[in-house]
């Protein structure tokens, strides 16, 4: 997938073809209880937004519309009368705004310099972590918990000493969970609390090894 996004100016589509002809809507395909469906949809959207490649998401996803798209009728705007659906729309709005004002997430989409895996093979926890980077050296750490299980602490090994300032999470936009790395004998680590089905981005502020963190 990374080869395609670098070589072919890759697009990451969640298009109309995915929500018609008996496939169900995006949120309708999510397993679990009612609340879990919303959490997993937000998780998917944050995973899509963090990946290299340009994004395409079909209308209705931001409303968490349960019925399939039907060209004979309008979207179910009445869903916005319900708090969970209104919150989904607000989340998608904030995620889109965050993307447009954060060059780290798109400036080097067509370069190997814009992406670095941090955790790619943690099958035991089903957690992925990677860095996105821009040309000025700014970095964002992106983590994704694809399970209904809380992980705390979830230990991430980083290639540098840093403080991690939470940028956005799909769990609660008001809950801030900043993190500091620690230096152990074999490298630098951050212990992060991951809620069930959480996706979270952190601004990375690198510090010198051994420097006292404030």
For each of these PLM feature ranges, what is it?
Residues 2-6:
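Short, small-residue-biased leader/transition segments that mark boundaries at the very start
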Residues 8, 17, 22-26, 32-38, ...:
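Carbohydrate-interacting/catalytic domains
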Residues 13:
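Conserved oxyanion/phosphate-binding beta-strand-loop segments in alpha/beta enzyme cores
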